[in-house]
Amino acid sequence: MKHRDRQPPEENLSAGRVEYLEQARQRQRRRRIRRTAALVLLLTAVVAFATGLVGASVAKAKDLVDSISIALRPDAGWPQNTGIPELLQLEQLSGCFVELGEDACVVYSNTGSRLNFIQSGYARPALAAGRTRFVLYNRSGNELRVESRTQNLYTKTTENGLYLCAVAPDGKVATVTGEVRNVAELVVYSPTMTQQLSWGLTSAEGIPLRMEFAPDSRRLAVAAVTSRSGQMVTNLYLLPLNQGDPQLLASQQDLIQWMGWLSGDCLLYTSPSPRDGATS
């Protein structure tokens, strides 16, 4: 009896078969990415509770969730119709930007993906932005919304009408409202919206028109307007958040139109006259 060696038949992969295998590999890669992201979030939560830094760590964990969610979204590309017909304000966040219109605001990633959409219905909407979150508030009302890049974090109603808001890089929020006993009240909240300090401004100190947190989120620059001997005066204060006692840095007979921190110790401000300046 003769034995013949049998060769296994060669498998011819059709184009459809190749495409199917490639799609399967892509699904596997996406599952691995999701499992890795879930593991990172779980480890972050374990570390937060193990170290006892729950309050601060929860805020950081929410920012981490946002960053992972944004990274996993497909790149939509540009141009895009953002749905804001009349732009009132534009602010930059980490990896994205937020646009404010008359009736709504929208957040888009730098790669063209829509991340968040808020229909506010506020009569006089305004934005204040930090690094990874922003505040949408009503300047003729008493409601504000703290938003991350992808979702609502907190909604707060103040006792008196809102004048101004500011957001620190680490998520702290400062608000200026009307006040019965004084001309205004400035309140600073932690990233979890727990009140940290308050300052009742007198008529001599003025009403804040500009606020800017320092890069380290530990100090707040405040430009407040008042009247002295029939003249308009702007007082520039520095408020250390760990002490709560405002320090008067400068006083001038002009509005401060803009101010910002050039570094951790240098604050730049501009006014209509040639007396623009910097202080440290």
What annotation goes with each model-predicted range?
Residues M1-R32:
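N-terminal Lys/Arg-rich, disordered targeting/topogenic segments
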Residues T36-T51:
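Hydrophobic membrane-insertion alpha-helices, especially the h-region
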Residues L72-N81, S113-I118, Q151-T157, Q195-L201, ...:
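A short beta-strand motif characteristic of beta-propeller blades
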Residues D75-D103, Q119-L127:
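Beta-strand-rich domains and repeat architectures in extracellular enzymes and scaffolds
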Residues I84-Q89, Y122-A129, N160-V167, G206-E212, ...:
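Repeated scaffold domains used in trafficking and secretory/extracellular systems
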Residues F97, F134, V173-A174, L220, ...:
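Hydrophobic beta-strand positions that form the internal "hydrophobic ladder"
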Residues E143-R145, N182-V187, S229-Y237, R275:
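Structural motif
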Residues Y269-A278:
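Conserved small/polar residues in nucleotide/adenosyl-binding loops
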